[in-house]
């Protein structure tokens, strides 16, 4: 799994950078962190589908265990979005067992990531957050049901539907 971090996340956490080509990588994600109400809001977005994971109250020492945290959040968010375990099993079976990091170079994806952060921030400010968990499944499900448009609004889709189409491609092979 490869995560391209925004400058804010790189400054906050300072992970080891490893350049990698992720143009059509099913395991490529973008991540951004912002402070909200004295706590960190971490949003991780899948590059190909814009599928979003939301974490609130993340501490710096928890970022050292980011791989299991993201894997569990992926599983929970996918099942909460209506995926069956049979549909998502191949994705996790083929998933790399570690995370590499680099700085984001795609301004379009960073802009979409910022929009996902806005949506998550809005929902958490309106509906609140789960205090017993840093993973905010309700915010992830909300972000994954909103339409994302590309190509000057000629192509619009829900991130969960796009992620499902990639899972179907993965399941066919």
Model-derived features: positions:
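Short, low-complexity, polar/charged sequence segments that are solvent-exposed and flexible
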Residues: 51, 62-64, 72-76, 120
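Globin-like tetrapyrrole-binding proteins
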Residues: 1-19, 88-173
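A short, conserved beta-strand element enriched in hydrophobic/aromatic residues
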Residues: 28-65
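Short, basic/aromatic recognition patches
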Residues: 12-36
């Amino acid at each position: 799994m490869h995560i391209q971090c925004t400058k804010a996340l790189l400054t906050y956490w300072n992970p080891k950078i490893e350049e990698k080509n992720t143009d059509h990588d099913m395991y490529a994600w973008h991540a951004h962190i912002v402070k909200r109400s004295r706590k960190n809001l971490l949003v991780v977005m899948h590059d190909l589908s814009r599928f979003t994971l939301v974490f609130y109250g993340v501490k710096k020492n928890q970022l050292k265990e980011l791989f299991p945290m993201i894997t569990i959040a992926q599983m929970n968010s996918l099942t909460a979005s209506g995926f069956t375990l049979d549909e998502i099993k191949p994705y996790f079976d083929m998933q790399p067992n570690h995370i590499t990091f680099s700085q984001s170079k795609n301004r379009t994806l960073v802009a979409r990531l910022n929009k996902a952060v806005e949506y998550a921030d809005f929902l958490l400010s309106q509906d609140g957050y789960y205090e017993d968990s840093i993973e905010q499944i309700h915010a992830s499900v909300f972000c994954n049901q909103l339409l994302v448009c590309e190509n000057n609004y000629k192509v619009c889709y829900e991130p969960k539907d796009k992620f499902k189409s990639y899972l179907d491609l993965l399941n066919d092979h």
